[in-house]
A protein has these predicted regions:
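N-terminal alpha-helical interaction blocks
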Residues: 1-45, 49-51
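Short Cys/His-rich local motifs and their 1-3 flanking residues in nucleic-acid-associated proteins
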Residues: 31-35, 54-57, 75-78, 96-101, ...
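Basic, short loop/linker segments at the boundary and entry of helix-turn-helix/winged-helix-like folds
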Residues: 48, 59-74, 80-172, 191, ...
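RNase H-like nuclease fold core
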Residues: 65, 140-169, 173-178, 187-282
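Residues in the recognition helix of alpha-helical DNA-binding motifs
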Residues: 184, 201, 362
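RNase H-like DDE/DDD metal-dependent nuclease/strand-transfer catalytic core used by mobile genetic elements
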Residues: 235, 260-350
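C-terminal domain-tail junction helix/linker
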Residues: 324, 345-414
Length: 414
């Protein structure tokens, strides 16, 4: 070594004094590669700086960065400024007046728009804007609606399976309230049952059906429509985000959220995407003009998941896009109307969990039991096991048996 050539003797390791702390084993000098025997702390009890006896250089034990991460505009390289912070993302904007993107967008404006822009610049979005999300796909999978088995065991209820089928038929298919269902069972069928028992049966059926419904393998098309409508939960507005296969009329998203924000739209899109074995390249969603859908699309683009979002704005066909996709928008509006008919007698829900329980029952009815005129008076999903009977209470019990078999198979350990 250089030390041995200069002093005609080998370099000795650092002398270890009793009671003193030295760098741990495995520590290596980043400059010359000397092992821990030749290293010692250079700033006393702080122990944040190490000196190497071989090369006589120092280095830090802590990782430090000269500056924070800087986000730059892809057009001009100018530093982006954070203009808004939301729960699940931050919005950054390029403020450079010489940015090529800004100049290009400015040239596209007409004389009237340029005059408006001078008077009110905030009415136009000409600068480069991007969102940085803090929600991962793993987090989306973890927060997917998971319903635990109900405390009510449907195999041990005091009433027969036929009564259970009648309860679900009147409560879900015909949109009756709990008390009206109890009344019609007593006055028409001479079955004495309380409205609370009906609520317990409905909750237990929903909890049993949900895993089977959520993981059912549909053969979906690439053309979907979506919309949100509000319901009341504890007197406050909550929002149902519906997604539906345009051609087959299959509901693919039906979760209720307390907020109508970008994250709710992201989660609604994700609940549809996870139902595809392979996401089609021509996947398209037709939605309204709410900006949360475009923001949700940007989130998936950053995750390298691509689909098209077409926004149909207003009630009239004022542009070619609205004229082309108006039928899809009308399909989701009719779905909202059908749901509102069932929801109207409920007068809201007492909890978000109870609201999602009803959504599970409604979606099961809509996808598997409700006949559609546009489908030749057939349900969106035809099951061979349901073709054997036209009796609706029997059909509900067949679906419950299918859900029970799925639950047993999914929880079985081999």
């Amino acid at each position: 070594s250089a030390y041995e050539a200069k002093h005609n003797k080998p370099l000795k390791p650092v002398f270890r004094h009793d009671g003193k702390i030295y760098p741990p084993k495995g520590t290596v000098c980043p400059h010359c590669g000397a092992t821990h025997e030749y290293l010692s702390y250079n700033n006393g009890n702080k122990r944040t700086q190490i000196r190497c006896k071989v090369c006589e250089k120092t280095f830090s034990t802590q990782k430090s960065y000269s500056q924070q991460v800087v986000r730059k505009c892809p057009y001009c390289g100018h530093k982006l400024s954070m203009i808004k912070s939301r729960n699940h993302f931050d919005i950054y904007k390029c403020m450079n007046p010489k940015c090529s993107h800004y100049k290009s967008e400015l040239k596209k404006l007409s004389k009237e728009d340029k005059a408006k822009y001078k008077r009110n610049p905030s009415a136009f979005s000409l600068h480069y804007i991007t969102r940085v999300f803090n929600a991962s796909l793993d987090m989306l999978e973890r927060i997917q609606l998971k319903i635990a088995p109900s405390k009510v065991d449907l195999s041990r209820i005091h009433n027969s399976k036929h009564v259970l089928g009648l309860v679900l038929t009147y409560y879900v298919n015909y949109g009756l309230s709990l008390r009206k269902t109890a009344l019609i069972l007593y006055e028409v069928h001479d079955i004495k049952i309380s409205h609370q028992t009906i609520a317990n049966y409905a909750q237990a059926a929903s909890h049993l059906l949900f895993p089977w419904l959520d993981n059912f393998k549909h053969d979906l098309n690439a053309y979907h429509c979506g919309d949100e409508t509000y319901v009341k939960v504890l007197g406050k507005k909550a929002y149902v985000f519906f997604m539906c296969d345009v051609k087959k009329k299959i509901i693919t998203s039906f979760k209720i959220y307390m907020k109508r924000d970008t994250f709710s739209a992201i989660d609604a899109f994700y609940s549809v995407l996870r139902k595809f074995k392979k996401i089609p390249k021509n996947l398209e969603f037709v939605v309204d003009g709410n900006p949360i859908y475009k923001a949700a699309q940007q989130y998936f683009q950053l995750k390298r998941i691509f689909f098209k979002v077409t926004q149909v704005i207003g009630l009239t066909n004022d542009d070619p896009v609205s004229k082309q996709h108006r039928p899809a928008k009308q399909i989701i509006e009719r779905l909202n109307r059908t749901f509102k008919y069932s929801y109207a007698v409920k007068n809201g829900f007492n909890s978000l969990e109870g609201a999602n329980d009803f959504m599970c029952l409604f979606t099961t009815y809509f996808n598997f039991l409700r006949n559609h005129t546009s489908l030749g008076y057939k349900p969106p999903v035809e099951l061979d096991c349901l073709k054997k009977t036209h009796n609706m209470p029997n059909k509900w019990n067949i679906l419950l048996d299918e859900a029970l078999n799925y639950f047993i198979e999914s929880t079985m350990e081999f």
